[in-house]
Amino acid sequence: DTDGRYPVVYFHDGQNVFYSKEAYVGHSWKVIPAIKRNPDISRMIVVAIDNDGLQRMNEYSAWKYKESNIPGMQFGGKGVEYGEFVMDVVKPFIDQEYRTLADREHTAMIGSSLGGNITQFLGLEYQDQIGCLGVFSSANWLHQEAFDRYIERKNLYPDQRIYIYV
């Protein structure tokens, strides 16, 4: 199809999305076989954003973790910058270079574990641009109190679709 425009799904931990040999723990989400097994799924563009292995714990959290198992080490707190990269660099590039439906209604974000944490944060921070979230097994225990305070301050969009799997 050379004329169609498509919704976009952004996945965090992108190395885990397509192929098990590239996945962090040797097992991927197998997105391509899942799409092939379900021909009724609407066509979409899947953007799999790899993490920076050494910075994953920092970039996938907007807040510092309440405790660290390594004395003198603090993790987290770079999620705002990561979000700006995704929403101000990656998304505009994808929308410019590919035939996307760039509006909020056709933009989704998915992540699991720490990827779930950054998905829920970015989904709230950019509610005006992200219409659907898939949050799977988020690691909220790392900064639950900070996230709760954050939610309390946000005006939530009641029509944002959020799918949570714990």
In which residue ranges do the predicted regions lie?
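Non-catalytic cap/lid and distal C-terminal segments of serine-dependent acyl enzymes
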Residues: 1-166
